[in-house]
């Protein structure tokens, strides 16, 4: 994967600001939460970009593309790397297609492989290890992902989970699977809606 030659930072930043504002307005009009795009907060998106830049992961997995706001920022953080593999999953084809359009509009369409698939199915069939995994999907299914996530993480791998402060009760059992596992060192960060970071230290 690589950054398309048409990428321009000023355009990217203004585009992301516009996308967040537009989708937030859309979300505010949706009664059913499942119809909302529910992007990460801008400060969380910037944090993801910083982690991607610092860590320089060669293999990245995002679970929960939605319409691509966090996807854009992860791709932004990866943009200086010569070679990497970034996969973003979503079960909703229309949202994945919207994300594809946003990536094209910002010159980052060559940076991400968008896959429409259930995360549980993907994780259970996956044989790869990822340096960075970002999880921001339907929280009710997180516990189903535990085994697949452990398999996809190795020493030095980083797992980041969104909404761990705003929706603490919904994710506490899932997070405990990592905080109580001696193979990981974990932190909860007061960034945006709350980010959880687990870094694998042992096999």
Q: Where are the language model's segments positioned?
A:
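A short alpha-helical cap/connector motif
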Residues: 1-132, 139-160, 165-203
